[in-house]
From Swiss-Prot:
Keywords: Coiled coil, Cytoplasm, Nucleus, Protein transport, Transport. This is Charged multivesicular body protein 7. It is found in: Cytoplasm; Nucleus envelope. Belongs to the SNF7 family. Residues 234-304 form a coiled coil. Gene3D superfamilies: 6.10.140.1230. PANTHER family: CHARGED MULTIVESICULAR BODY PROTEIN, CHARGED MULTIVESICULAR BODY PROTEIN 7.
Length: 422
């Protein structure tokens, strides 16, 4: 039994699980609550378990074994699976495969472990599900397909127009650990028009959709030509590595023979090394030529994209200026200037209304009066700055103080009234 990744809360409740493990009624109408309660428990649990275990397909017998509890298997799983097929959360593997073009079936069907297609009425209606019949989970397959597409677009393979079968397996090894899962994911990608498959000279080639492109384009002769060049470069690299290793080996053998005093064998090894080095030079020249062609193709592709961007920009600019002409622009500018002049005239006219009722002579006379008043204010004497009396003094004290500051003849005291001196 595969351990459940997350046991539901009811799993330890014997009474509740006894009910959930029991068989369904013959029809839902007999007991709606009983039927719906079991479905709400089992359907999410099956999907969660499959996703946690990394399963893209399941079988009835597998689920009965995985959900076995205290030696008992759930009795209603067949009914649950039939309901999931009706809802579309599960699909028979045969139905899933049959929806893809025959070009892919020639590859996928040899690797998928499925039963032969039996186009009987019962199979087409989905009324019977065998205990070992594979059932795929479309939701999980779509998630894996999206991961594979992201992996391709972020890997070094994105610069390859075509991938061979071995390269596809390398790309998807972590996401799809077995061939059956890989083919289900590739079938989904092909159904979504994210990949295109071609068989050529007994070799399967896959083309992935480019970044920011909705659907994959059919494999063209240009794609095949670039693929052949890349394969040729790869082959030359392998031969160069092998020739380099052979050259090093012959050098070591020549040194060994020379130390042993076998000069003839040492010279023979050196002659072979010369031939190998000549072959290395030829291989290197061929590889350089192929790399130069690939670089030119890449540059041409870049130029094509730039020209396409220019064309789109010109089309957008043309569309933006569709109803705009030089005459119309000049006419609009003239109208703007005309209305600006009109506004200036209106402002001047409105501001002159208040000035018409005021006599300029009166204004000038009023201004002169204001200036004269300012001059009078300026000519006033300064404010006295003598000492300030802080506290009142008695009359005698005040008299003595004034006498000290008055003239010697005492004229000031005589001018002061007598009552003030008392």
């Amino acid at each position: 039994m595969a351990p459940l990744s997350c046991n539901p809360p009811e799993w330890e409740d014997d009474e509740r699980m006894s009910f959930l493990f029991s068989a369904f009624k013959r029809t839902r109408d007999v007991n709606t609550c009983d039927w719906d309660g079991k479905m709400k428990f089992w359907i999410p649990l099956i999907l969660t378990h499959a996703r946690a275990q990394g399963l893209l397909s399941i079988t009835l017998s597998q689920l009965e074994n995985d959900f076995r509890r205290k030696g008992c298997a759930p009795m209603g799983l067949r009914t649950v699976i039939q309901e999931m097929i009706r809802q579309g959360t599960l699909r028979k593997e045969t139905d899933f495969v049959s929806g893809v073009s025959s070009g892919w079936l020639s590859w996928g069907m040899r690797q998928l472990v499925i039963r032969p297609l039996r186009w009987t009425i019962g199979t087409m209606l989905g009324s019977q599900v065998g205990p070992d019949e594979p059932l795929v989970i479309p939701e999980v397959i779509k998630e894996r397909a999206a991961l594979v597409l992201q992996r391709y677009q972020s890997s070094t393979f994105r610069s390859f127009p075509l991938l061979c079968e071995e390269e596809v397996h390398t790309l998807c090894a972590e996401i799809c650990p077995n061939p059956s899962a890989l083919n289900l994911v590739l079938l989904q990608l092909q159904g979504d028009k994210k990949i295109c498959v071609l068989e050529r000279a007994g070799q399967k080639l896959v083309k992935f959709v480019r970044v920011s492109v909705g659907q994959v384009e059919p494999i063209s002769e240009s794609d095949l030509g670039i693929y052949q060049l890349q394969q040729g470069e790869k082959l030359l690299s392998e031969r160069l590595q092998s020739a380099g290793e052979e050259s090093n080996r012959l050098t070591e053998e020549a040194r060994t023979y020379n130390r042993a005093g076998n000069k003839n064998q040492a010279l023979r090894c050196l002659r072979k090394r010369k031939l190998v080095e000549r072959r290395i030079t030829e291989l290197q020249n061929k590889q350089d030529n192929i790399q130069g062609i690939l670089e030119r193709i890449s540059a041409a592709e870049t130029d094509r994209k730039v020209v396409s961007a220019y064309q789109m920009g010109v089309s957008a600019l043309k569309q933006a200026l569709k109803d705009v002409t030089l005459e119309k622009a000049e006419s609009i500018v003239d109208q703007i200037q005309e209305y600006c002049d009109l506004q200036d005239d209106l402002s001047q006219t409105l501001s002159s209304v208040t000035d018409a009722d005021v006599d300029s002579d009166d204004l000038e006379r009023e201004l002169n009066e204001i200036l004269q008043n300012e001059e009078m204010i300026i000519d006033l004497p300064d404010v006295p700055s003598g000492p300030v009396i802080i506290s009142p003094k008695r009359p005698t004290e005040w008299k003595m103080d004034q006498a000290a500051h008055s003239p010697a003849d005492g004229s000031f005291l005589r001018s002061v009234p007598e009552p003030m001196l008392q």
